[in-house]
Amino acid sequence: MNAFFVFCTPECFLSLSALVLLLWQALAKIHDKSIGILVLADYLVAGVLLLPFVENQGIFWNGLYVWDKMAVLWKVFFLITGFLVSYLSLESDRLIPKARSEFYILPLFTTAGMALLASVRDFILLFVGLEIVTVSFYVFVAFQREFPSALEAGVKYLIIGALASSFLVMGIAFVFGITGSTQFDEVARFAQNNPVNGPLILGLVFILVGLGFKASAVPFHVWTPDVYQGASTPITTYLAVGSKAAGFVVLLRILNLPFYDPGFQKHWIPLISLMALLSVIVGNLAAIPQRNIKRMLGYSSISHGGFLLMGLSAHNKIGCAAVIYYFFAYMVAIFAAFLVVILLEKNQPSGVSIKDFNGLYLKNSLMAWSMAFSMISLAGLPPLMGFFGKLMVFFAAWDSGQHLLVIVGALCAAAGLYYYIGVVRAMFWTEPDNVQRIDLSPATKLLLWILSVGSILLGFYAEPVIKLVGSVLS
């Protein structure tokens, strides 16, 4: 691994950029908005630096770090996520006036940690990457110190996050104690040549508990609605997409290498299936009575975690491809939804409820249509991208014999239509209290158009995207 390649990796470039911006801000006192724009430029430059190495493959740092097509795909995903979160931060008016520049800069470290997780091949590096991400969110969630709800959310996230990290470390300790190594290859080799014993299974269970927190999977979901509601909306979006994806990219890595042996599979497949079943049931049913939009989307996120776990439980190539495709569909829909929420928060600083969407079509038709496409995609209705994501997950799970899981998942998806369509009904068929127009900047209009049209086109042309994901996995 030469020095130029190391510099061009997103985790290295973004970390160095963040350090430079922090020092520059401390010495030169740059305007906060200028810092935010520079952060957006950093994400674009990181994406450009990635291009020459897309086809590269290799294992580096004595087996700790892998560079393959799947790693590149997830790094691109995290760069897009970081870029969009930074734009949402610039658009949001609810941030604290003090230390706003740090609010723009710190996500660079978070994205670097997520990019590192895309390439992990060792449990120690896995823990380091997850802690970079988790500790960053401890700061972000409680950033709005003047709001009691933000402090409450921050404390809850800190306590449960620390507990999850403890389980993860304990699981890694069990795996190391039995196999004598933390490298994925060595653990897989040990499982092939030796019977999988009780302590090793216990280590696997502890690791799944730790990662279940990141995925907001039931029964490790209790923090999700409160933290989503209490955190600032850009950070809620980052938790819903980036943090969840970080947990799943690690699950994809460990379940398909160190724990791929049939001796492990007969234990983790039922556990993953149970978490998937509980998540789709609890997430969808708990979302129905919610009136706060962020809390509703928090429970919705739990249900989507269940559908993603359904793809993992299939333990086949189709299931892994379904998880990746589903995440891209989910990212597009969630960012469109939360961008609309941020725009509404300018007039509702205390929080946006479902009734605040009443007559949105009359106030700004682009916002209404963007939110409608987002809700329809999250609900899994054709022909949008979210429909094909759910269809792939169901097909993969059915093909692997998880028939009950698919039937329950389909019923829960149907139940979820109630709260998704409720938002659409409020925007188009409910009279508003006032018809005050909402004006948007040209950049925000463009982003809403891109997210809306992207969800439609990637639904109509899902086949080439699915083939691309399949080629990455091959």
Curated annotation (Swiss-Prot):
Membrane topology of the entry: Multi-pass membrane protein
Subcellular location: Cell inner membrane
Tagged with keyword Transmembrane helix: yes
One GO cellular component, as annotated: plasma membrane
EC number, as in UniProt: 7.1.1.-
Species annotation: Methylacidiphilum infernorum (isolate V4) (Methylokorus infernorum (strain V4))
Main location, first listed in the record: membrane
Gene: nuoN
Domain of life: Bacteria
Protein name: NADH-quinone oxidoreductase subunit N
Coiled coil, from the record: none
Enzyme class: translocase
